[in-house]
């Protein structure tokens, strides 16, 4: 099953605690807590292109599974990582954050862990 599609954030748990722990300023945390971001994913084999729109902020990135890439962190920094894929699951480690993204039908769950704090996002395919 391919990740390709457009997904809207449906729910998230522990947003504020996680964002503060990774260094996002309080005013940005406050602005971001109610935004229903849209993620557009295009998958071509091991190649991914992702556009995330959260309010007025747009983040673009691309990566090839198993190869080093640069991704933008929550604080706006760029960091190198290697994204791994196992079936319908993508895993990456970026600046101490473990990210596990899993596709199940029309639902994408993204679980992020940092220093024992877990942030979970659930998005549903809208096209």
Swiss-Prot record:
Compartments, as annotated in UniProt:
Cytoplasm
Source domain of life: Eukaryota
GO BP terms, alphabetized: fatty acid transport
Give a yes or no for keyword Ubl conjugation in this entry.
no
Keywords for this entry?
Answer: Cytoplasm, Lipid-binding, Transport
Q: What is a single Pfam family found in this protein's UniProt entry?
A: Lipocalin_7
Please describe the organ and tissue distribution of this protein's expression: In adults, weakly expressed in the intestine.
Extract the SUPFAM superfamilies matched here: Lipocalins
One GO term in the molecular function aspect is:
fatty acid binding
Q: What is its main location?
A: cytoplasm
GO CC annotations on file: cytosol; nucleus
Q: Quick check: keyword Glycoprotein in the entry? A: no
Tell me the domain comment: Forms a beta-barrel structure that accommodates hydrophobic ligands in its interior.
Protein family membership = Belongs to the calycin superfamily. Fatty-acid binding protein (FABP) family.
The free-text function statement in the UniProt record for this protein reads: Binds free fatty acids and their coenzyme A derivatives, bilirubin, and some other small molecules in the cytoplasm. May be involved in intracellular lipid transport.
Q: What is this protein called?
A: Fatty acid binding protein 1-A, liver
Instruction: Tell me what gene encodes this.
Output: fabp1a
